[in-house]
């Protein structure tokens, strides 16, 4: 029978519930179990697709085109699985589904209520995730903190699941904070005690408490927490700040967390073999070289907006025993006068995805600098579109060239709406989303990176290169190295007379893994290292 683990959080948000859940998933997978994982977000948006990155961070796109929480990126990178649309559920999705059923008459004229209708819908999403993947273990992270009014239906639903399928098939893990008061020189357990009290008042008794802390947790403190929270002392797990995220699974294993889980769920699996993972962490901790990449974006104040990009750069660096340092450059501050000062000390330049016109001209200046000074360049989504616009303006001399998204009245719409997007009015869930094939031209940097004729990558865009300009740009040395199989849509562009200048319409960062870097990032970092060594 499928087992279910629920991860909740208390005291404050951003405690690392997602990393805890992902780390446990990796440990259980390495015990030979088929693991899937999902995130329940209590906000009323249907998905984060239309939310500002300042509100939510990165939008992570799955193979099947779901726009999801950034924690799914952690899940995929840690557990090395590809998730789907069932892996992220919001209050908005739940209510939308229930209301549609009510309109269809599926409730037979009954009064639709939070209990049982909303809670039953939540439970169905939990069970469906296990059914769709045939999982041995389903890990479900509940977003927000215990006590939030938005979370109550989710907590009630996961409480009911234990009654539905039995205590041996359900486990509750609660993540909390033990703050350190510097002035007093003390760590305080009271917030954790109150958080667990709140959870228990809702009918959920945690089986494991994971305490986030800056300082070591003494045995006396663990005993105190165990007493007040009514759990075994060994089930108080310390989650101290780590030098690398990838060390967290090893820390949890050292404290036997995965064994406690298996004992509770009656899973008789051998211990997790973490030899390869340990080697990865040792490599990460002992990188001998450095390279610096400029990330020119408009959300640089909130680095979570580009978390998969940064992780993909790091993964690529691991292959070359290199620590990739990211220099955050606010695109709004970049001008032709100061670009040398802002990016001149870096070994490569990356322009990531985005929407809207803010910071666009600064990104174009940075791209021009990379092109003219032979600095390795990687453009992603909007970065690819702006690389095309920069070339049209400054090489072809098409003054005023732009994207119709940024300037609907541009005389040269180098980037324009996809034909199928012309009549779309809704913003949410209407982009070109998910995994699509890309055919690569031989003897190009893109082909050399992948070494395959056709690759599949994840997309999230509404605008596309305007084929009207392809012949003139090709004549001038602009290479269309990747297209859709029918040749209609431009997927990858690069420059002929440049050491390494590649830009992709898709989001290659979404499929990178710590032990298997994404090919374009791998070659971009290699080119950046070569550039540094040649200076």
UniProtKB/Swiss-Prot annotation:
Record-annotated disulphide pairs: none
The keyword Nucleotide-binding is assigned to this record: yes
Domain of life of the native organism: Bacteria
Name the UniProt record assigns to this protein: CTP synthase
Family listed: Belongs to the CTP synthase family.
Binding, L-glutamine: 54, 354, 382-385, 405, 462
Keyword hit for ATP-binding: yes
């Amino acid at each position: 029978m499928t087992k279910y683990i629920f991860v909740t959080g208390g005291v404050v948000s951003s405690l690392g519930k997602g990393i805890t859940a992902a780390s446990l998933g990796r440990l259980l997978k390495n015990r030979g179990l088929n693991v899937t994982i999902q995130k329940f977000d209590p906000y009323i948006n249907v998905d984060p697709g239309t939310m500002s990155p300042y509100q939510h961070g990165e939008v992570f796109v799955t193979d099947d085109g779901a726009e999801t929480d950034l924690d799914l990126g952690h899940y995929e990178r840690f557990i090395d699985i590809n998730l789907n649309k069932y892996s992220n559920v919001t209050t908005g999705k739940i209510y939308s589904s229930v209301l549609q059923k009510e309109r269809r008459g599926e409730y037979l004229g009954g009064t639709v209520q939070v209990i049982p209708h909303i809670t039953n819908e939540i439970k169905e999403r939990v069970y469906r995730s296990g059914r769709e993947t045939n999982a041995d273990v389903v890990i479900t992270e509940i977003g927000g903190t215990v006590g939030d009014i938005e979370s109550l239906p989710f907590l009630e639903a996961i409480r009911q699941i234990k009654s539905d399928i039995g205590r041996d098939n359900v486990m509750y893990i609660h993540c909390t904070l033990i703050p350190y008061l510097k002035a007093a020189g003390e760590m305080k357990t009271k917030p954790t005690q109150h958080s667990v009290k709140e959870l228990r008042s809702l009918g959920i008794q945690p089986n494991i408490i994971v305490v986030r802390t800056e300082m070591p947790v003494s045995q006396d403190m663990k005993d105190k927490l165990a007493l007040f929270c009514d759990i075994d002392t060994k089930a108080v797990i310390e989650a101290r700040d780590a030098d690398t995220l990838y060390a967290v699974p090893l820390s949890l294993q050292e404290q036997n967390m995965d064994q406690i889980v298996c004992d509770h769920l009656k899973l008789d699996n051998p211990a997790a073999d973490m030899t390869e993972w340990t080697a990865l962490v040792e490599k990460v901790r002992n990188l001998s070289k450095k390279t610096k990449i400029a990330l020119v974006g408009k959300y640089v104040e909130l680095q979570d907006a580009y978390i998969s990009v940064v992780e993909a750069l790091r993964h690529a660096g691991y292959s070359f025993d290199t620590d990739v340092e990211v220099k955050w450059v606010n695109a709004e501050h970049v001008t032709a006068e100061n670009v040398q000062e802002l990016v001149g000390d870096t070994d490569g330049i990356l322009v990531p995805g985005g929407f809207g016109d803010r910071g666009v001209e600064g990104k174009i200046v940075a791209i021009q600098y990379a092109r003219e000074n032979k600095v390795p360049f990687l453009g992603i989504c909007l970065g690819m579109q702006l690389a095309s616009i920069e070339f049209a303006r400054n090489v072809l001399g098409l003054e005023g060239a732009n994207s119709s998204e940024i300037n609907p009245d541009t005389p040269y719409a180098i980037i324009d709406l996809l034909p199928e997007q012309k009549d779309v009015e809704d913003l949410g869930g209407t982009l070109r989303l998910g995994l699509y094939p890309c055919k690569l031209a031989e003897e190009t940097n893109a082909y050399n990176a992948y070494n395959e004729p056709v690759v599949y990558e994840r997309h999230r865009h509404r605008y596309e290169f305007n084929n009207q300009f392809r012949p003139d740009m090709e004549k001038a040395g602009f290479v269309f190295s990747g297209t859709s199989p029918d040749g209609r849509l431009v997927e990858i562009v690069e420059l002929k007379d440049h050491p390494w200048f590649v830009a992709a319409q898709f989001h290659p960062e979404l499929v990178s893994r710590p032990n298997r870097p994404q090919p374009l990032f791998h070659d971009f970092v290699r080119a950046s290292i070569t550039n540094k060594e040649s200076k």
